[in-house]
Design a protein with these regions (language model features):
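Catalytic cores of the polymerase beta-like nucleotidyltransferase superfamily
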Residues: 1-190
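A short, hydrophobic C-terminal helix/tail in secreted or cell-surface proteins
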Residues: 191-195
Length: 195
């Protein structure tokens, strides 16, 4: 019986996530970007990531969209050009291209792994591995990915931490802070998932 009730509530949460990701499409012309990236090749993919996914789970207003893709920045640029989507190179060396549709900006960042860090900036190597990308993120709730239909990839149980009001580093907190000292500020300024 408990399992049945638990499945009901999990289903309800999943349905809510799907509804909220569809609501994003009503407020943001993001589907055009998903289609552009997916048109690059049969293997290319794109997901919502970070703050926008966290806000969906916390029932907060999504005011900016961060996206992650398994194609490199040059391939992102080719995909956007091919689909007549305006863009600028926000931080191409770090993998970020900003697409612009209807005066709305969407940061698209290629999957990556850190090869060296200096306490603030990292040298990165682009990757096609979603888990590897998640491992370089700061907190578990920022390593949740969602496709356009609301299906979730959550390798570090960030959703559970959100539900429990926890802010949890991925990996060793001391090491993560040494990689990027800004993370200590983010730790103390991260909104509580229970606010």
């Amino acid at each position: 019986m408990f399992k049945l009730i638990n499945n009901f509530f999990n289903l309800s949460k999943n349905d809510l996530l799907k509804k909220n990701t569809l609501d994003i499409q009503k407020n943001f012309p993001v589907k055009k970007i998903f289609d552009a990236i997916k048109s690059f090749s049969d293997e290319s993919d794109i997901y919502y990531v970070g703050g926008c996914v966290r806000k969906i789970f916390c029932h907060e207003l999504v005011d900016d969209i961060d996206l992650a893709t398994n194609i490199n920045p040059d391939e992102v640029i080719l995909s956007l050009k091919k689909n007549n989507i305006s863009f600028y190179e926000t931080g191409k060396n770090h993998g970020t291209i900003t697409a612009i549709i209807d005066d709305k900006k969407f940061e698209i960042t290629s999957l990556r792994k850190d090869i060296s860090t200096d306490g603030r900036h990292a040298k990165v190597l682009f990757s096609k591995d979603w888990r590897e990308d998640a491992e370089r993120r700061d907190f578990t709730f920022n390593s949740i990915y969602s496709n356009i239909d609301g299906e979730v990839f959550d390798p570090f149980n960030g959703r559970k931490d959100l539900e429990n009001g926890c802010v949890t580093f991925i990996g060793d907190p001391s090491k993560r802070i040494k990689e990027d000292y800004l993370r200590i500020c983010l730790l103390y300024t991260s909104p509580s998932p229970r606010d």
